[in-house]
Amino acid sequence: MRIAFFSAQPYEKEPFEKVNENYKHEIDYHESILNKKTAVLAEKAPVVCVFVNDKVDADTLKVLAKNGTKLIALRCAGFNNVDLKAAADNGITVVRVPAYSPYAVAEYTIGLLLSLNRKIHRAYVRVREDDFNLNGLLGHDLHGKTIGLLGTGRIGGLVAKCLKLGFGCEVLAHDIKPNKELEKFGIQFVEQQEVLAKADFLCLHCPLTPDTEHLVDEKLLASMKKGVKIINTSRGGLVDTKALVKAIESGQVGGCAMDVYEGERRLFYRDLSNEVIKDTTFQQLANFPNVLVTSHQAFFTAEALSAIAHTTLKNVSDFASQNNDPSVIVKN
């Protein structure tokens, strides 16, 4: 099938082309982010492949449907950027990659937590400038600290076990569906308020839905233990960034490490080093000394890219042969 591949990055082409040797699809790579204006690039393509920052809203879907698109193939797990009702109304099936490498994201979460706590990102910059002073780089032992987790799916579960068994942390978790297997490792499931009140570090591992958008808002931040450090490798929209900035300024939040940002569509996966970034909220956040921001790269391993390519192209082939698959979100 012909696939219009949006938000294409140079590092994606090799794994997709390698896997596609077995599937023989025709892939047209477009660097453009998908939206209602760029949707015309998918004309006569029955399949459109999108990533996290593509805007697959009702207006975009209407254009795609008019031009013959029958399948939206997400090459990611999250689908909050897709209007599922509009897809169904336009007769478009939606599939995703439910899991590619939970280890990649879990390991990166631990890396961010360690870097934030021990200020490794600041130490690296200092040494490059021949500044070997340790002032301002004091961290804390993780052993014995309380880690709070909101969400214990595949990724959250791996993070929980790593911190409990590997570092000797006390791990308190909250999930609408508690993972009983994790309790065997000494991980405690408690109410959300208890997690917030006791956590020295809070890791977010929940999906972005209408119910979880701005989950971390002014009220929630005020209810947390003073000086808490927050790590988010899930979705940027979980955090009200303006409220977070205020909480950092007041000292209520002691720092944060974020691989995602609610306004990342305008920033991430682009080289803006020679441009003026007009998002003042992001600029303010990123310039705090106790904040570490990376550009949505937690998933970014060779193994994950290969798995994403395999699942995405298999989803397309399954659609072509009308095979049912658990990757389907909206079926038409």
Swiss-Prot record:
Single GO molecular function: NAD binding
Sites where the protein binds NAD(+): R154, I155, T233, S234, R235, D259, H296, Q297, A298, F299
Enzyme kind, highest EC tier: oxidoreductase
Disulphide linkage map: none
GO cellular component term of the entry, any: cytosol
SUPFAM superfamilies per UniProt: Formate/glycerate dehydrogenase catalytic domain-like, NAD(P)-binding Rossmann-fold domains
A Pfam match: 2-Hacid_dh
Enzyme Commission number(s) of this protein: 1.1.1.-
Protein name: 2-hydroxyacid dehydrogenase homolog 1
Family, as annotated: Belongs to the D-isomer specific 2-hydroxyacid dehydrogenase family.
UniProt KW Cytoplasm keyword: yes
Keyword Endoplasmic reticulum annotated: no
CDD domains: LDH_like_2
Subcellular location: Cytoplasm; Nucleus
Main subcellular location: cytoplasm
Active site as annotated: R235, E264, H296
Keywords linked to the UniProt accession: Cytoplasm, NAD, Nucleus, Oxidoreductase
PROSITE patterns noted in UniProt: D_2_HYDROXYACID_DH_2
